[in-house]
């Protein structure tokens, strides 16, 4: 069906209410195939208001007399109200938005039509390939190699074409290990920690099943991991499921690594919620944050009952366990749950932020997102199909990536000088994960992105964020490089609600933006002052 067939009315007169303390905009409302536009007129500021229709999570419409109201609850947690002249126009616009905001076809989405000035197709897609990370690993150790056994995605559709595996294991053994792991997700290198000579790996669960099957090649691969580490190294398998859940998985074909089959490896269960419970926690938190008339006791009870901060605590605690085992005990770590595409990636990416100073730079953080989330197979299209307002029954939705961003925000709050990027970067990543003009978060894995030709037909988010006008909003002006590991506290007293995100629909953004700009101005003035001062040698008198 063509876009024009879904647009029931071309335009209407409307008034837009955008949020607290923001003046309403009145003008002509128009609908295109991908956007809702409001043009207030030549004298108004802004001169054009624009909303990507993919950002709409739910629509509510009311009619009274000869006018109507449409409330749009957006995936980025904003709530917008449109007061429209004419009942028929109101209903037609609501139906058009409903149809256009729920298109499922990837290739008809806006990134395939977005052509901004100053950007070229293909730019920035090559910034963070696995080969670049492998080169850094190869400078530190020769125990690993770059394998292209997955060149045609036949081993694992959710892995990239090239992955890093132990040098002592050939591609035929890798292929047999892939058949033994859920989704073909055989153990691959996620991070090499040079100070201790240990590694962080990720995988899917082993398919042992009720018969307790084994795979000699999979066992060989994990033996090679320990052999390639420092002498006497041991390993921990961090299973993000409870022991009971792991046993239940074995009855349906999954399972865990048998102790006898993997000597040198010890299994640790650190259960993390995923799927529907996590989505419901997110929904309850957003509902509580949107209620402006509740008492203090009611608010605190709802904040506790939604358990969102408990998920943050458990995630940070598990990431700290993995990082501490590598840094202080010299152990290798393998992380997996069931599929290995959700809580597994949470832990591997957070552990790297804790340990690796490079991951805390702007470029390093972008590489981390690309390598540990996009290329590692997090199913963004399924997980971010709806946000917290949708009335549709959740199927595959889960705010796993949001939970990661919240944990990173907690890191930034506890270590305000150690991250080169600021809250603006985290908010931008949240927004683009759910609705974006760029192609980075499209599809569910690399195979799908190749089939849709995402890299040749859409722009990379990283090219958009690298523009000078964006950098000031994304960078942390207080950043000071920190070569050490940063150890966050996961105690309840140390965790805070991420107000910049969860309260963005109920508090005006301007005070925060003004404060952020003021900090930048102070830092800029200080740098100018220091730059204009004479050096010690120049100020010393001559002989």
Swiss-Prot record:
Sorted alphabetically, which Gene3D superfamilies does this protein's record hold? Pleckstrin-homology domain (PH domain)/Phosphotyrosine-binding domain (PTB)
Q: Which SUPFAM superfamilies match?
A: (Phosphotyrosine protein) phosphatases II, PH domain-like
Q: Which GO terms describe its cellular component?
A: cytoplasm
Tell me, which GO biological process terms does this entry list? Answer: negative regulation of autophagy; phosphatidylinositol dephosphorylation
A GO molecular function annotation here is: protein phosphatase binding
Please name the InterPro entries in this protein's record: Myotubularin, Myotubularin-like_Pase_dom, PH-like_dom_sf, Prot-tyrosine_phosphatase-like
Q: Which residues form the Myotubularin phosphatase domain?
A: 124-502
List the CDD domains hit by this protein, alphabetically.
PTP-MTMR9
**Superkingdom:** Eukaryota
Q: What does this protein do?
A: Probable pseudophosphatase.
Q: Which family does it belong to?
A: Belongs to the protein-tyrosine phosphatase family. Non-receptor class myotubularin subfamily.
Name of the protein in its database record: Myotubularin-related protein 9-like
Which organism encodes this protein?
A: Bos taurus
């Amino acid at each position: 069906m063509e876009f024009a067939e879904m647009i029931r009315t071309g335009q209407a007169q409307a008034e837009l209410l955008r949020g607290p303390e923001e003046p309403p905009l009145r003008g002509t409302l128009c609908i295109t195939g991908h956007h809702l536009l409001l043009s207030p007129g030549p004298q108004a500021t802004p001169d054009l208001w624009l909303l990507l229709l993919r950002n709409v999570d739910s629509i509510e419409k009311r009619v009274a007399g000869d006018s109507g109201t449409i409330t749009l609850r957006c995936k980025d947690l904003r709530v917008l109200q449109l007061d429209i002249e004419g009942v028929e126009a109101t209903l037609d616009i609501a139906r058009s938005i409903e149809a256009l905001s729920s298109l499922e076809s990837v290739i008809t989405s806006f990134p395939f039509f977005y052509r901004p000035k100053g950007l070229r197709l293909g730019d920035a897609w090559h910034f963070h390939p696995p080969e670049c990370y492998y080169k850094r690993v190869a400078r530190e150790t020769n125990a690993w190699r770059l394998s292209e056994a997955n060149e045609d995605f036949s081993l694992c559709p959710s892995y990239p074409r090239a992955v890093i595996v132990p040098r002592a294991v050939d591609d035929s053994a890798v292929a047999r290990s892939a058949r033994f792991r859920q989704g073909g997700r055989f153990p691959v290198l996620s991070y090499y920690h040079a100070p201790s000579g240990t590694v962080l790996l990720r995988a899917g669960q082993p398919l042992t099943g009720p018969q307790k099957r084994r795979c000699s090649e999979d066992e060989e691969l994990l033996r090679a991991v320990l052999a390639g580490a420092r002498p006497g190294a041991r390993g921990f398998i961090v299973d993000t499921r409870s022991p009971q859940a792991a046993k239940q998985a074995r009855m349906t074909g999954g399972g865990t690594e048998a102790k006898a089959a993997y000597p040198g490896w010890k299994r640790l269960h650190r259960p993390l919620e995923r799927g529907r419970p996590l989505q419901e926690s997110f929904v309850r938190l957003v509902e509580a944050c949107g209620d402006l008339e509740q008492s203090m006791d009611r608010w605190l009870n709802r904040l506790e009952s939604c358990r969102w901060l408990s998920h943050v605590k458990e995630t940070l605690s598990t990431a700290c366990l993995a990082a501490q085992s590598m840094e202080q005990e010299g152990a290798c770590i393998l992380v997996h749950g069931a599929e290995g595409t959700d809580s597994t990636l949470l832990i591997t990416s957070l552990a790297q932020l804790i340990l690796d100073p490079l991951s805390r730079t702007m470029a390093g953080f972008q590489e981390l997102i690309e390598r540990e989330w996009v290329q590692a197979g997090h199913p963004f299209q399924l997980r971010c199909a709806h946000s917290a307002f949708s009335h549709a029954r959740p199927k595959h939705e889960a705010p796993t990536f949001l939970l990661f961003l919240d944990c990173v925000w907690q890191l930034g709050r506890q270590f305000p000088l150690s991250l080169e990027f600021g809250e603006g970067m985290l908010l931008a990543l949240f927004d683009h994960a759910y609705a974006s003009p760029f192609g980075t978060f499209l599809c569910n894995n690399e195979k799908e992105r190749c089939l849709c030709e995402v890299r040749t037909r859409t722009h990379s988010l990283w090219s958009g964020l690298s523009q000078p006008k964006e950098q000031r909003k994304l960078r942390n002006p207080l950043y000071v490089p920190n070569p050490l590991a940063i150890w966050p506290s996961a105690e309840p007293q140390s965790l805070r609600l991420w107000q910049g995100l969860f309260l963005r629909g109920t508090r005006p953004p301007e005070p925060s933006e003004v404060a952020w700009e003021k900090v930048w101005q102070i830092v800029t003035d200080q740098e100018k002052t220091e730059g204009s001062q004479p050096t010690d040698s120049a100020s010393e008198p001559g002989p």
